[in-house]
Amino acid sequence: MSNDVKIGRQFLIDEFGVRSETIERFEHYHSLVLKWQPAQNLVSRETLAHFWVRHICDSSTLIKLNGPKGIWLDFGSGAGFPGLVTAILHKQLNADGPSSVVHLVESNKRKVAFLRTVIRETGINAVVHASRIEKFVENSDIKPDFISARAVTALKNLQVFSEDYVSKGSACFFHKGRDINGEIAEAANIFDFDLVKHIQALPGNRQSDGVIAEIGTIRRKTS
């Protein structure tokens, strides 16, 4: 077992009290990433060796902020961060059902197939929507409690996708880089919004690459 796996497993046990079956789901998720990686390039080569800390632990921060509850909408899910991690933790921490589900929006057909494989083989409560984000937003009647995104697009674009949901009570939690101030300034040309930056701390004395931007209100500016 690599040091990354040991640190990641212990973090999940310490922070969430996860049981063996949840660890096994994460292990199976990891094995599927390794299996699909050569053809799909699901994660960068630089972070693959630190999968548990850089991706699983990093994504789990959302549960620490909000608890295992509610309907989640994850934009541009890619390899499943943070959406699949959220759903795997929900499986144990909250009896998953209609009130606790993660909706993953992804347009890449191969990544859609990967996400559906993980969901099927781990038995988690998540749904994949094979769509571009803008098309999904136009046509969906889902009413999420929380919206997430990680390494997808600029903050201003995420706010465009999210503004109608937020007006109905949704809260946004976007993983962004530590250089987020430039994106905030750019978004402020279009929207008035309330934003809280949560600094992420990763286990094993690793420095996180970013912050989580929590947004509770989005109001489009009028000229």
Locate the predicted segments by residue.
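Conserved beta-strand segments of alpha/beta enzyme cores
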Residues: 101, 125-127, 171, 192-195
